[in-house]
């Protein structure tokens, strides 16, 4: 085993996921030194795009595998984590240097639920990644490992002096989330008294309550992204105080809006816009404003991989850093609410059926 570590990328067949794999293959310092585990829901029917990309892995001597993980199933997540942990423990594959939680789910014209009984956006974007991360902590590189969460402006972010997109800012009437969060009941994703179950179970901003309202699905996606950012902050704080895991870094990146299949469950106009128009506009948008709202998957993949491996500008242990593309940014006010974050963490332990001994994180409860 000559590799320095393992890189795991969830959702490797999607637009950004495939671009991340392509960028890893393109970098000589990564393709030969790291073993790749690229997860897809179905390694046959759901992997055509990434399989085409991986056709040239052999020519750059990149050892890798496709691993089936259905993030809509907690049992599937547990099976995959057991498999990875077993192989790291017996030396078949090296410890995890980078765990990139890329997979996502968004829908506007439908409202889907998992067999576990959760809202699909909540489970795929957040809960399954929460479970996978805690289960895999034992297999992380304890000196240099990084866990990377993918954020989104749809949760809220603040770049001082540059941009504001916050569910809690009443003056934000023209921002990209303005119409999503205009109704008073949605100006906080978690209102007091804190209730995470409505979001988890799909009762919050449901299609049944808002038939035909495309913003209902966008809100659920944004709320799931808020949960991911709360997880990123909570986990980075807990890991920092853990004597065995304190050298592991937890980072987050907002990759921006890109041409991808994430919008295929939307109205046909939006699908065509994202599929055919945005790919033409994105390169110009990146040239004009590299970290603006619209970006190419190539640019975003570069930012994601940089956050997972860069030491020159981010340092050896960039724990707790949130990036908007390639720039350090700040999360919104609700993501900083310590009580909400703790409540979500504790409730998520119940939702994911996590028990003592499942994770090596000392402050797991």
UniProtKB/Swiss-Prot annotation:
Disulfide bonds: none
Binding site for NADP(+): 16, 52, 70, 102, 221, 225, 260
Any one GO CC term of the record: membrane
Catalytic machinery residues: 221, 225
Family matches, as Gene3D superfamilies: NAD(P)-binding Rossmann-like Domain
Residues with attached carbohydrate: 90, 291, 324
UniProt keyword terms in alphabetical order: Glycoprotein, Membrane, NADP, Oxidoreductase, Transmembrane, Transmembrane helix
GO molecular function, one term: oxidoreductase activity
Superkingdom as given in the UniProt entry: Eukaryota
Pathway involvement of the protein, from the record: Mycotoxin biosynthesis
EC numbers on record: 1.1.1.-
Transmembrane segments: 267-287
Location within or outside the cell: Membrane
InterPro entries (alphabetical): NAD(P)-bd_dom_sf (IPR036291), SDR_fam (IPR002347)
Membrane topology: Single-pass membrane protein
Protein family membership: Belongs to the short-chain dehydrogenases/reductases (SDR) family.
Function: NADH-dependent flavin oxidoreductase; part of the gene cluster that mediates the biosynthesis of ilicicolin H, a 4-hydroxy-2-pyridonealkaloid that has potent and broad antifungal activities by inhibiting the mitochondrial respiration chain. IccA to iccE are sufficient for ilicicolin H biosynthesis and the roles of the remaining enzymes, iccF, iccG and iccH within the pathway have still to be determined.
Protein name per its UniProtKB record: Short-chain dehydrogenase iccH
Organism: Talaromyces variabilis
Primary gene name: iccH
């Amino acid at each position: 085993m000559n590799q320095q570590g393992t890189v795991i990328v969830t959702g490797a067949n999607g637009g950004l996921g495939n671009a991340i794999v392509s960028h890893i293959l393109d970098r000589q310092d990564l393709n030969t030194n790291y073993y790749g585990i690229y997860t897809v829901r179905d390694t046959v029917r759901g992997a055509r795009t990434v399989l085409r990309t991986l056709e040239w892995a052999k020519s750059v001597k990149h050892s890798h595998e496709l691993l089936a993980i259905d993030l809509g199933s907690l049992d599937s997540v547990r099976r995959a984590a057991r498999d990875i942990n077993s192989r790291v423990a017996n030396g078949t594959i090296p410890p995890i240097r980078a765990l990139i939680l890329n997979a996502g789910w968004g829908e506007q014209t439908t409202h889907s639920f998992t067999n576990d009984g959760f809202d699909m956006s909540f489970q795929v974007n957040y809960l399954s990644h929460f479970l996978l991360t805690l289960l895999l902590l034992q297999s992380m590189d304890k000196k240099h490992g990084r866990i990377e969460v993918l954020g989104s402006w749809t949760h809220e972010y603040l770049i001082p002096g540059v941009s504001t997109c916050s569910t809690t800012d009443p003056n934000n009437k023209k921002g990209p989330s303005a119409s999503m969060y205009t109704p008073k009941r949605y100006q906080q994703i978690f209102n007091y008294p804190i209730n995470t179950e409505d979001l988890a179970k799909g009762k919050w901003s449901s299609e049944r309550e808002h038939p035909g309202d495309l913003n209902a699905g966008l809100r659920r996606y944004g709320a799931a992204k808020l949960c991911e950012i709360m997880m990123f902050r909570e986990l980075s704080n807990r890991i920092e105080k853990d004597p065995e895991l304190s050298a592991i870094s937890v980072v987050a990146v907002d990759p921006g809006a890109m041409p991808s299949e994430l919008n295929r469950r939307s109205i046909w106009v939006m699908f065509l816009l994202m599929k055919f128009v945005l790919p033409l506009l994105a390169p110009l948008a990146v040239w004009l404003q590299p970290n603006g709202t619209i970006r190419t998957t190539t640019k975003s993949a570069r930012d994601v991989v940089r956050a997972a491996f860069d030491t020159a500008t981010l340092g050896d242990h960039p724990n707790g850093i949130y990036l908007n593309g390639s720039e350090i940014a700040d999360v919104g006010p609700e993501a900083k609410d310590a009580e909400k974050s703790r409540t979500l963490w504790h409730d998520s332990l119940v939702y994911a059926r996590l028990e003592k001994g499942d994770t090596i994180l000392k402050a797991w409860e």
